[in-house]
């Protein structure tokens, strides 16, 4: 898995750090090089880290319910920055209130995300998807 780098962080005004650390550990143990930009991260910080490290994937976490607002336009900014083909994964409690996950997923896929995960998804699911999407 040499060279398979991913950028991991918690977007927006979200300070939920525990899940971020768990994901960092799980992806590292699975053999990925994790660039963890931590909490309170802007879209620009994700993109800058991805460019600087030649990452294959940006993984966005959001637990405070405003992920939909915070993630809007990320794919377009990636395209403008020359990394339009990068894989975009997002997961967590992405919206305020109780909404059908299938509807939330549709909206994030329409925003250009490749994978969307509901609250409570185990890291192994994302690891399996990473291996498929990166053809490992």
Swiss-Prot record:
Pathway where it operates: Amino-acid degradation; L-glutamate degradation via mesaconate pathway; acetate and pyruvate from L-glutamate: step 1/4
Entries under SUPFAM superfamilies matching the protein: Cobalamin (vitamin B12)-binding domain
The protein's required cofactors: adenosylcob(III)alamin
Ranges of residues in domain B12-binding: 3-136
Keyword Isomerase: yes
Pfam families, alphabetized: B12-binding
Sample GO molecular function, one term: metal ion binding
Residue sites binding adenosylcob(III)alamin per the record: 13-17, 61-63, 93-97
Enzyme Commission numbers on file: 5.4.99.1
Oligomer status and interactors: Heterotetramer composed of 2 epsilon subunits (GlmE) and 2 sigma subunits (GlmS). GlmE exists as a homodimer and GlmS as a monomer.
UniProt function note: Catalyzes the carbon skeleton rearrangement of L-glutamate to L-threo-3-methylaspartate ((2S,3S)-3-methylaspartate).
Family assignment from sequence similarity: Belongs to the methylaspartate mutase GlmS subunit family.
Record's protein name: Glutamate mutase sigma subunit
Organism: Desulfitobacterium hafniense (strain Y51)
Name of the gene: glmS
């Amino acid at each position: 898995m040499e060279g398979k780098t991913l950028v991991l962080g918690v977007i927006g005004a979200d300070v939920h750090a525990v899940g971020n650390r768990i994901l960092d550990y799980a992806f590292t143990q699975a053999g990925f090089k994790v660039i963890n930009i931590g909490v309170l991260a802007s879209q620009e910080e994700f993109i800058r880290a991805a460019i600087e490290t030649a990452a294959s994937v940006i993984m966005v976490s959001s637990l405070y319910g405003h992920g939909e607002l915070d993630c809007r336009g990320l794919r377009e900014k990636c395209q403008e920055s020359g990394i339009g083909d990068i894989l975009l994964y997002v997961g967590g409690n992405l919206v305020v209130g109780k909404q059908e996950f299938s509807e939330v997923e549709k909206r994030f896929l329409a925003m250009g995300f490749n994978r969307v995960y509901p609250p409570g998804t185990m890291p192994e699911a994302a690891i399996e998807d990473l291996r498929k999407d990166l053809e490992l």
